[in-house]
Amino acid sequence: MTALTRILFPLPDYRRTPWTLLQWWEARRLTYNLFVGGAGVMSLAVMALVSSLPPGAPGLGFKWWGGVLIYGVAANVGYTMGWLTEVGMRVLWEEEAPLAGPALFRQGLSFAVGLTLLPVPLAIFSWVMRLVTHLF
């Protein structure tokens, strides 16, 4: 099994108490933050590069730090919702609750990384539009 497979398809928590579910989720938080943070660094780098290409546009400046901090907190609040969702399912359906942790983790990670990379095509589209308006 590859490292990526182990990350994306972890074994579920079979004990299923709120405490063990919390431990299961917290054991993966650093991995989640590394993936989302890496995507964020890549997005910022591409946006800085694209904004520096002619025809000119305002650069990123230092105003983006606040947005990065807010986004990081929001991403971790969203991550916490995975644990709360799984505990809620356990409370509602008791023993019949599905082992949803791995699927929730995968879906949440995919959504967060995708949302974090969304500025890349937007920045490229913005540059193409600047180029078109500059040429015509």
Name every feature range the model reports, one short phrase each.
Residues 1-65:
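Membrane-associated alpha-helix detector
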Residues 41-44, 74-80, 84, 113-121:
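Hydrophobic alpha-helical transmembrane segments of multipass integral membrane proteins
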Residues 43-51, 116-136:
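Alpha-helical transmembrane segments and their membrane-interface junctions
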Residues 59-88:
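Short alpha-helical packing/oligomerization segments
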Residues 66-74, 100-117:
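Transmembrane alpha-helical segments of multi-pass membrane proteins
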Residues 84-99:
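Cytoplasmic membrane-interface regions of multi-pass membrane proteins
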